[in-house]
Amino acid sequence: MVTQPIPEFQGRIGRTLEESEPYFPAKQHPGGEAPNVVIILMDDTGFAQLGCYGSDIDTSHIDALANNGLRFTNFHVTPLCSPTRAALLTGRSQHSVGMRSVSNHQTGFPHQLGHITNHAATVAEVLQSEGYATFCAGKWHLAPTNDISAAGPFDQWPLARGFDRFYGFLEGETDQFHPELVVDNQHIDAPAKMEGSYHLSEDLVDQLLKMINDSKGIRPDRPFFAYLPFGATHAPHQAPDEYLRK
């Protein structure tokens, strides 16, 4: 985690109000040239399934992102959800941050805590401390199973690990048509939509865009970090009919 030092008071306290001078610390801002950062994570998806890496599967939108963004082709992934997320968000080996396996398991040993160790900072915590707005919409799977009920504790939920806002689900999987959802630190009911008109992937994108628009509408100069970890390519495999017909 990133701990913020308490700003030293630089005003003056006199015997009267006239003799005193208030002090308001400046808000942290990364500067005008700081870029917006968007990370999209697809669950249980191999690189050979993407058109930009030679697949025959139509992934035109993903291909456009790859062609117009950055490709990081030397990242170590595991065939498990939580370890890859822990490594991606910390930039460190999953073993060194307490996540050798999925967060469902806690062994009582430092390499498998069921969450990212508090001695490691996430990229969201680092950017948040530098003045970024930070948003997460999607699958978390970085908190112990026993700690994700409505009663908490909330110390390993997204808002405690560097994100200003969260919309998504905390476990490893959820029904894509009738998901179990959390907003910030509160469990909510799934949106009431007509059968066949709702899919979680679209909802996640819509909610993330709302977060960004809300932030930019009030502080347009503030850059954002958006983390969008989809859950659709993980079990249960539930695609909209238009994709099943292909």
Predicted regions and their residues:
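Formylglycine-dependent sulfatase
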Residues: 1-246
